[in-house]
A protein has these predicted regions:
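Active-site loop segments of alpha/beta catalytic cores
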Residues: 1-41, 80, 89, 114-357
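Intrinsically disordered, low-complexity segments enriched in proline/serine/threonine
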Residues: 28, 54, 58, 66, ...
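Segments that shape or occlude catalytic/ligand-binding pockets
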Residues: 34-72
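A contiguous, low-structure linker/loop signature
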Residues: 69-120, 140-144
Length: 357
């Protein structure tokens, strides 16, 4: 499946993170797998071919492209992950949601078995020796290397296992079994993170959606009391090894940011409009590298190509600076007009070097 890696070199990514004057703003243009059944495939391939800055490794194949869907993104094919959570989706390529929670009834808790972090990511099996070998191959090729914890690793995972409403009720009432479950999740994640450190990756990415359209999914006080200590333990070996910590959350996380950042986060990946460009700039510009997730709700699906061009420039001027501290990522999903997709690709290419002009 064709998606971009970052347009920038390993050296430029490191310079952006460390405020050491990158040659350009690192850009990532991700094409969700659902797009290959929504758009004319040749039209998408044409756009990729026309924008080599965003897709530096793209090679057009002469055979028909067959989309590959993740286990949790196959319509009509429910998937039970290694935590026992049953996933379903209505559209091929779009990650589904958990429809059956293995501990919806906590009377089952004492019989509940965690997956083995030496053999599983939580979603599927993993061979850590193979992972280390792949990291070594990428390093030998001069590429940026990553260790990616599964998306929704702690609080969301607890919700997937127990159910969102029951999770919040349990935390409010400080139910011992749920608090124990949360601690066990932290230990599971920590075991995986130690493998990333052992493999000597450049960056450890820790993604979990904590925000909604307005405000967080969990109160700041509850996050601070129950989830933050787990985060702190998870980040400690990454900090001690001198690796880059990349933290991701969708949604409005403004009231959680200070607690999220306290663990020594080097890169924060958050959404632009729901948090506000000016707020993001005021909190992070010149201090912490922002991996800015570009709007998918208003401007890119419904704006004009001219508005999109102006918006990408505004993002870079508002949040970035000549020394670095900014990366941009855009995720393409069905529904964005092709002319807007083209405008996005062109603007991301055009303004990547804005601070070097």
């Amino acid at each position: 499946m064709y998606v971009s890696t970052s347009s920038a070199s390993r050296e430029d990514i490191l310079r952006a993170v460390r405020f050491e004057g990158p040659e350009c703003v690192p850009m990532t243009f991700h094409i969700n797998a659902a797009c290959w059944n929504h758009y004319d495939r040749n039209a998408l391939l044409d756009l990729m071919e026309e924008h080599p800055f965003l897709f530096p490794d793209f090679r057009r194949e002469q055979i028909p492209l067959v989309p590959e869907y993740d286990d949790v993104a196959r319509a009509g094919q429910p998937y039970v992950d290694d935590f026992g959570c049953k996933w379903e989706t209505a559209m091929d390529g779009i990650v589904g949601s958990v429809h059956e929670h293995p501990l919806a009834d906590m009377s089952r808790y004492r019989d509940y078995r965690f997956p083995d972090p030496e053999r599983s990511t939580g979603l599927r099996a993993i061979d850590w020796e193979e992972f280390e070998a792949e990291v070594a191959r990428q390093k030998a090729a001069g590429l940026m290397t990553y260790g990616d914890l599964r998306h929704g690793h702690t609080f969301q995972q607890l919700c997937d296992i127990r159910g969102y409403v029951d999770t919040l009720m349990d935390l409010a009432e400080e139910e011992p079994e749920t608090l124990e479950l949360l601690e066990r999740l932290g230990e599971f994640n920590l075991a995986q993170i130690r493998h990333f450190v052992k493999a000597d990756v450049d960056m450890v990415r820790i993604p979990e959606d904590l925000g909604m359209q307005n405000g967080p999914m969990i109160s700041p006080d509850m996050f601070r009391r129950f989830v933050k200590p787990i985060y702190q333990k998870m980040l400690q070996p990454v900090r001690e090894a001198g690796k880059i910590i990349h933290m991701h959350s969708d949604g409005d996380i403004r009231t959680l940011v200070e607690d999220i950042m306290e663990g020594g986060v080097d890169v924060i990946n958050l959404q632009d409009r729901v948090n506000g460009l000016e707020w993001i700039a005021g909190r992070f510009r010149g201090k912490t590298c922002v991996d800015l997730d570009i709007d998918r709700q208003k401007i890119t699906p419904f704006g004009s190509p001219q508005q999109i061009d102006a918006y990408i420039r505004r993002c870079i001027e508002t949040v970035g600076c000549k020394e670095g501290g900014l990366m941009l990522i855009y995720g393409l999903y069905p529904g964005v007009p092709l002319e807007n997709v083209k405008a996005l690709m062109a603007a991301m290419t055009r303004y990547a070097g804005l601070w070097q002009e």
